[in-house]
Amino acid sequence: MGQRVAEVQRKTKETDIKLILNIDGNGDYKISTGIGFFDHMLQLFSHHGKFDIDLEAKGDIYIDDHHTIEDVGIVLGQAFLKALSDKRGIKRYAHVILPMDEALIMVAVDISGRPYLAFDVDFKLPKLGDMTSQMVVEFFKAFVWSSKTTVHIKKLAGENDHHVCEAIFKAIGRTLKEACTIIDDRIPSSKGVL
């Protein structure tokens, strides 16, 4: 099995993004999006998933954070899809229930080739630091669509929006790491393709 690394670039009139992803990394990261809270969430994702991420994103954040966060989701999803190649040998399915103080988050993943997001999380505040709360779901929509992955994210408990969001990014990192784990040399589908 070769190294599962992907490099993706995306340049539009709104954003300029460069990403290198190593699925079989150590959780090393160099992340810069211009949105501090979002950087922190991606760092947690990298650390808890043990994905090496080198990400530089420049966007029109003088307008708002929408284009940058959504496009990072697109690029990260494309990188996972590219790095996993034909998905030979991966576990494919994984789930985790993760606490962060009073917050409790459930995440389940199927690296199926079929994009679907079930996002059952409410945030009380309009902003998380310098990040718009609504952009959490938009990030995951973009990631799921471009990675062709089914993801369920459900808040089981939680009062503090920061804790809830941290738990989500930690949980998705851990869940994807498990789903990407190599367990044999077969395509994990009765169809023979994902």
UniProtKB/Swiss-Prot annotation:
It catalyses: D-erythro-1-(imidazol-4-yl)glycerol 3-phosphate = 3-(imidazol-4-yl)-2-oxopropyl phosphate + H2O. Keywords: Amino-acid biosynthesis, Cytoplasm, Histidine biosynthesis, Lyase. InterPro entries: IGPD_sf (IPR038494), ImidazoleglycerolP_deHydtase (IPR000807), ImidazoleglycerP_deHydtase_CS (IPR020565), Ribosomal_Su5_D2-typ_SF (IPR020568). Its main location: cytoplasm. SUPFAM superfamilies: Ribosomal protein S5 domain 2-like. PROSITE patterns: IGP_DEHYDRATASE_1, IGP_DEHYDRATASE_2. Signal peptide: none annotated. The keyword Amino-acid biosynthesis applies. GO terms for biological process: L-histidine biosynthetic process. GO terms for cellular component: cytoplasm. It is found in: Cytoplasm. Gene3D superfamilies: Imidazole glycerol phosphate dehydratase, domain 1 (3.30.230.40). GO terms for molecular function: imidazoleglycerol-phosphate dehydratase activity. It is an enzyme of class 4 (lyase). Its EC number is 4.2.1.19. Pathway: Amino-acid biosynthesis; L-histidine biosynthesis; L-histidine from 5-phospho-alpha-D-ribose 1-diphosphate: step 6/9. HAMAP family: HisB (MF_00076). Belongs to the imidazoleglycerol-phosphate dehydratase family. PANTHER family: IMIDAZOLEGLYCEROL-PHOSPHATE DEHYDRATASE, IMIDAZOLEGLYCEROL-PHOSPHATE DEHYDRATASE HIS7. This is Imidazoleglycerol-phosphate dehydratase. It comes from Caldicellulosiruptor bescii (strain ATCC BAA-1888 / DSM 6725 / KCTC 15123 / Z-1320) (Anaerocellum thermophilum). The lineage of its organism: Bacteria, Bacillati, Bacillota, Bacillota incertae sedis, Caldicellulosiruptorales. The gene is hisB.
